A protein has these predicted regions:
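Structural motif
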Residues: 36-39, 114, 136
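Terminal, non-globular segments
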Residues: 15-17, 27-28, 72, 262-277
Length: 277
């Protein structure tokens, strides 16, 4: 992994590019000395990236300040990663997280590895965890399927800022855009060109049914799982998004979720302990 150091905080943040088939993922490693755990942050879908960016980065720094090494990244075709977004699929993004998870979990020294996802990122993290990656899983507001997240984004975008730039005769409702996607057309949403194929596939990109009951899966697999439903007060991490200039205090959210991670690290049921005794 090629990296370039940043000095924006007291903890080293290494920005670089991670090679995947046909593209390079932009990554930032929040590196710590003598980590007690590592976390891979799987962020929300493309069109929400810029809105949730600030609290997502602050969360990574919060964890790093508590000796948890964090890797965050942009999806293939999104943000500063390379790749053509309209050519991407959930399969590509699933492949990316598998490769990143393997790299992160294999870093030295070996410590517990936690997958953490937000909205569509929660589905990606959940599916990767279900396939055997990770010693614990933390999910924020996972939808039942990706279409729930895409649909709510499209509706808010169609009802909000999108219409400010259109003449009255060119304004369309969310249902109009959905109809175009269903017919196979491309629709630009928050700067990203959604394809009809992506829209169709989103209905079938689901959370694993094995993760429906977090307590049961934690007990059965001996790998802790926590699912958190974020409220409207968690904007701009989740929809509906408020104004760009509003600053939300996430200290309580960060604290509660860190406490869960800390409890996981002291728990004897960790798969990591069983494999490394």
């Amino acid at each position: 992994m090629q990296t370039q150091s940043s000095t924006e905080s007291i903890f080293p943040e290494q920005a670089g590019y991670f090679s995947v088939p046909g593209a390079h993922l932009y990554t930032v490693l929040h590196q710590v000395t003598d980590p007690v755990a590592r976390v891979l942050l799987v962020g929300p879908f493309a069109s929400e990236r810029h809105l949730s960016y600030n609290p997502w980065v602050r969360w990574a720094r919060y964890l790093a300040a508590r000796r948890i090494e964090v890797l965050r990244y942009d999806y293939r075709g999104v943000g500063e990663s390379t790749g053509v977004f309209e050519e991407m699929s959930f399969g590509h993004w699933s492949e990316d997280i598998q490769l990143l998870a393997g790299w992160m979990a294999g870093r030295s020294p070996r410590v517990p590895f936690i997958l953490h996802g937000l909205e569509v990122g929660a589905i990606l993290a959940g599916r990767t965890f279900d396939e055997g990656s990770g010693d614990a899983l933390l999910l924020w507001s996972p939808p039942a399927n990706a279409n729930q997240a895409l649909g709510s984004t499209l509706r808010q975008w169609a009802a909000g800022g999108r219409q400010l730039y259109e003449s009255s005769e060119n304004r369309r409702s969310a249902s109009g855009y959905i109809r175009e996607l269903q017919e196979g057309a491309f629709v630009q949403v928050q700067g990203y060109l959604w394809s009809g194929r992506l829209w169709r596939d989103s209905f079938h990109f689901n959370m694993p049914t094995t993760l429906n009951e977090e307590n049961k899966v934690s007990s059965d697999s001996k790998r802790p799982v926590k699912i958190v439903k974020l409220g409207k007060d968690a904007s701009p991490l989740v929809k509906p998004f408020r104004g760009y200039l509003e600053v939300t205090d996430f200290s309580e959210l960060y604290s509660r979720n860190f406490e869960w991670i800390a409890s996981v690290l002291s728990s004897p049921i960790r798969k990591f302990n069983e494999e490394n005794d």
